Amino acid sequence: WLLQRITERHLAYTTVNQAVCALKFFFDIVLGRTAEAITIPYAHTPQRQPEILSREELARLFEAAANLRTRTLLMTAYAAGLRVSEVCALRVADIDSAPDRMCIRVVAGKGGKDRYTLLSPSLLEALRVYWRICKPRDWLFPRTTDAAQPFDISSALRAYYRARDRAGITKTGGIHT
């Protein structure tokens, strides 16, 4: 009955799950048939893949960045596969450019876990140019108003969306896609 209602009326997953909750309540509490209530499955929303930016779109995005710091921050996020919070929290000491290592240390990433990610030669060159010009001391991307603090996540997101709009990129998604 429920499956027929779903297919006929093209119900949203949340609506379907409300009906499932009502049925589970009815079977479990009203009828006392817990076993039947457990077997009614919930509807799951399909997982959508994010829209990935092409190389040409990435080049336009980096070119549209407001300044060298923002450009290098965006390049680091994309080249190393970092979340915005991770790239903002990078310290100069987290960059290991030794030829036998070439990695970036991510401290307290998703789930509070530390990890290492690859440092490509092209990103290393961009980071060296940035370092020579901006000379960051502790934080790789410090705040402009207070160098003792890391770049603010919301400011990084704003900078990304501004660059995306300036570059004429219409794909949806955030800095992490």
Label each region the model flagged.
Residues 1-177:
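Conserved catalytic core of the tyrosine transesterase superfamily
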